[in-house]
Amino acid sequence: MDKYTNRDHPDYIPGTFNIYSSQNLENGIIYESKLKKTSSGVVLIPQPSYSPNDPLNWSSWRKLAHFGLMAFITAFTAATSNDAGAAQDSLNEIYGISYDSMNTGAGVLFLGIGWSTLFLAPFANLYGRKITYIVCTTLGLFGALWFALAKRTSDTIWSQLFVGISESCAEAQVQLSLSDIFFQHQLGSVLTVYIMCTSIGTFLGPLIAGYISAFTNFRWVGWVAVIISGGLLITIIFGCEETYFDRGQYMTPLTSCQSGYEDGTTLQNSDNTAVSRRKRHLDAKLSTPGAMGEKGVDLSETAEFEVNNEEEVTIPETRELIDGSKEHLKPYPKRVAILTKATNLKGYGFKQYFKYLKINLRMFLFPPVWLSGMFWGIQDVFLTFYLTTQESAYYEPPWNYSDFGVAIMNVPTLIGAVIGCICAGIVSDYFVLWMARHNRGILEAEFRLYFSIATAIIGPAGLLMFGIGTARQWPWQAIYVGLGFVGFAWGCSGDIAMAYLMDCYPDMVLEGMVCTAIINNTISCIFTFTCSDWLAASGTENTYIALAVINFGITAFALPMYYYGKRIRLWTKRWYLQSVNLRDGV
């Protein structure tokens, strides 16, 4: 039993990994097969099964094809969620739809993104990942069509609700799909591309929509989205492979840590009291009064996280483990099936659906979820502010920008976001591995937070340069550099938020991202309604000084989390394990 890979081990701490095999794991053999590792000796986490249908065993081209589709979904939904501004002048002039109504539509969009993420998430655990992409793309197509035909205020508001729902699949489902096909040590780089795609859609979407509106008319902003949504929907239906795979049913190299016997095709646990065995593992460290963990944490404090007596933790009964090496690759029609029923689906899954909703909401009790949500959410708030400032200030003297000039202001922000993604993603992957090598191979989730230092300095500096520069009419070069700094903080913070949370609770990726999306988009919704009033009441310069202070303050939360993060993960371990067992036992 290895404490870094087996969550039943009494010394297991979520978010603490050993990038190299420990002595126990190196000697652990099942069917004469050692643990799977990279060519450089990094242990693959999670350990793949022997089945050709395991997404972790997909060929490189299959992974790249799926990754490319997920990247396009992310970029496209981000773009459609930010393109309405290109049509607001025309809607105001032709139909008298006020700018306040457009802001209301933006607020509704954020609510649609955040809360539909929660209500759609259980479908991924019941009917596979693919169905959510189909539902979201279909609703996005409908929202774009409604916007293309908009003539009334209600059209501009309610169409944005459907557009927001369409982006919800990129808030949590995409990350889940990517974690299905990539290993732990690859997620930093993968998330970098994810955040870059979000950046491209967020910053280039308004630019492209502006050109479409200028060269045709504002309705084509919606019609182009309809056309692309239709093509994307067809691609998803016929080309998107399902990544749901119940690895718990299959033998992996880690099953060498279990007692069992070989019967030719299966491995069956010889201990028929799986529940009591798991209880012994959990209670050994977690239920002993005054038991002390690493850094002197009193584990008895976790008692407050115990499940109520009337709420049973359902753990699947002991079952035979399948030797996946004897399976054949599924035929293509089954690999792209619209629905892939979960192995634990009961009937139509109505009761399970509401149980999954409850489990998702449990993640609000985990401090790293709040840190991730605030990191991501506050950057979206700044996005709202500087886009509003661009639209309200730069059409007027002394700037006198055209629609194209204002749209071009998104380019330096995009460049900064790409650099931030690379810094917090690819560079951080090498950095955390370097840190782990100097820590006896032990990788802590908090290593990712080192890169918050750059965000805490560069982000506020960018807000000050843009805000004060706009108010005092500085040269455009200083203002554009400020926008680049803001973009850097946007990309860097997003990457840190996603990677840190996925490292902290690797078996609850979807649930964590759902709560992060709710926090993020609820914060964004609130500030969408207050942005214009704040700028009008305090003025551009004072508003951006306040935003810079808020940026630094929220980013500074990374410091106590770095020092106390492992203690918090240990403190929430029992609740985490119970949540995983509840989900897997639904």
UniProtKB/Swiss-Prot annotation:
GO biological process assignments: monoatomic cation transport; organic hydroxy compound transport; polyamine transmembrane transport; transmembrane transport
InterPro entries named in the record: MFS, MFS_trans_sf
Protein location: Membrane
Source organism (scientific name): Saccharomyces cerevisiae (strain ATCC 204508 / S288c)
One GO cellular component term noted in the UniProt record for this chain: fungal-type vacuole
This protein's encoding gene: HOL1
The protein's name in its UniProt record: Protein HOL1
Keywords: Membrane, Transmembrane, Transmembrane helix, Transport
Parts of the chain on the Extracellular side: 1-66, 125-130, 211-219, 384-413, 470-477, 530-544
Lineage: Eukaryota, Fungi, Dikarya, Ascomycota, Saccharomycotina
One MF annotation (Gene Ontology) recorded for this entry: inorganic cation transmembrane transporter activity
Biological function: Seems to be involved in the uptake of several cations and of histidinol.
Domain of life: Eukaryota
Pfam families linked: MFS_1 (PF07690)
Membrane topology annotation: Multi-pass membrane protein
Transmembrane segments: 67-87, 104-124, 131-151, 190-210, 220-240, 363-383, 414-434, 449-469, 478-498, 509-529, 545-565
Cytoplasmic topological segments: 88-103, 152-189, 241-362, 435-448, 499-508, 566-586
